[in-house]
Amino acid sequence: MPHSTADRRLRLTRQALLAAAVAPLLAGCALVMHKPHSAGSSNPWDDSAHPLTDDQAMAQVVEPAKQIVAAADLQAVRAGFSFTSCNDQGDPPYQGTVRMAFLLQGDHDAYFQHVRAAMLSHGWIDGPPPGQYFHGITLHKNGVTANMSLALDHSYGEMILDGECRNTTDHHHDDETTNITNQLVQP
C-alpha cells in the first residue's frame, strides 16, 4: 500500500507540473484578439469599411515620424517602413509600420522623457489608445500609436509607429522593409 500512495503522489505532482506548464501557453492564446475583417466593424483596430491605400497607410505613419524626428531633434536616425498584418495569419487588413532607431544622448530615461515631452507638445496623447497594451513609453495621435524603448544596442532608442488596420491590400508575401531614413532626416 505505501508503494501505491507514493505512486499516486508522484502522478499528482506530474499532473500539477504539466498543468502549470500548459496553463501559460493556453492563457497566451486566449490573449490574442481576433480582429475581424468586416465592413462596418466596431473593432477600433479595423475599419475596413473605409480602407486606406498603400500610399495613405504609409503616409499615416511616415508623416508623424518626420514630425517626431524634428520636434525632438533626434540624431543618427535610421528608419524603415513595412506593412504589418493585423492578425496572426498574415492576412489583411494591414497597418503601416515605421521602425526607427535614434542615438540616445545622456541618460536613456531622461532622454525618453525629452522625446515624450516633445511629442506631447505636438498633440500626442500619453498612453496607448483604449483597449491596447504596450511595454515601454507609449503615446498615440490620430490613429497612430508610438511605442518607445531601448534598442538592442543600448546607445540607441527605438520607436515603433503603427497605423490603423485599414489597408486591405494583400501584403502577405511582402518581405522587404523600405528604408525611409532620408524621408525623416532634414538635410
From Swiss-Prot:
Subcellular location(s) of the protein: Cell membrane
Keyword Lipoprotein among UniProt keywords: yes
Signal peptide positions on this chain: 1-28
Lipidation (S-diacylglycerol cysteine): 29
Record flagged with keyword Membrane: yes
Keywords: Cell membrane, Lipoprotein, Membrane, Palmitate, Signal
Lipid-conjugated positions (N-palmitoyl cysteine): 29
Protein name as annotated: Putative lipoprotein LppJ
GO annotations of cellular component type: plasma membrane
Highest taxon of source: Bacteria
Topology of this chain in the membrane: Lipid-anchor
Gene name of the record: lppJ
